[in-house]
UniProtKB/Swiss-Prot annotation:
Gene Ontology terms describing biological process: translation
Protein name: Large ribosomal subunit protein uL10
Keyword field contains rRNA-binding: yes
Complex and partners: Part of the ribosomal stalk of the 50S ribosomal subunit. The N-terminus interacts with L11 and the large rRNA to form the base of the stalk. The C-terminus forms an elongated spine to which L12 dimers bind in a sequential fashion forming a multimeric L10(L12)X complex.
Stored HAMAP family: Ribosomal_uL10 (MF_00362)
Lineage, highest ranks first: Bacteria, Pseudomonadati, Myxococcota, Polyangia, Polyangiales
Gene Ontology terms: cellular component: large ribosomal subunit
Any one GO MF annotation of this record: structural constituent of ribosome
SUPFAM superfamilies per the UniProt record, alphabetical: Ribosomal protein L10-like
Amino acid sequence: MERSQKEVLIGSVRQKFERMSSAVFLDFKGMNVEAVTKLRDEFRKSGVEYRVVKNTLVRHAIKEHPWAKTLSKSLTGMTGVAWSYEDPSAAAKVVKAFRKDNQKLQIKAGLIEGQILSGDAVETQLATMPGKDELRATLLATLQAPLQQFVQQLNAPLQNFAYLLKAKEEEAGKQA
């Protein structure tokens, strides 16, 4: 590969690291083509970009970041990088689900907001984080709860009055 091509590739990888919300570094040694293709499909469905990149190109692309030295220790052997742009936990969730059926896929490290995570931390912490949609639903439920309680309090006297009338009606029916 010519030097100019390498520079373009390094620039492309650098741009991915600048845009990402998180990244997961994987070792796919021992996996067959079918399994790797299935993994790529799962990443694509989740909006995660996955690419196999030479370790030296990644090192050059991240060298200006303060966490580069720490991450470089994990960049050995074959490395696949999964970048999440929207949902920080998307790549980790795909990897965790995929590893249930394929233990050959190994997590080397993770990266989120400048923090390097171990492979175990990616699987136990990052993969269990709620996604954007889950957080939105939780926020919406939290915002709606006081309003729903207020409406219930407003309706309570009417309900109680209706129960009272029904009880009086049943009592009158028993006396007759």
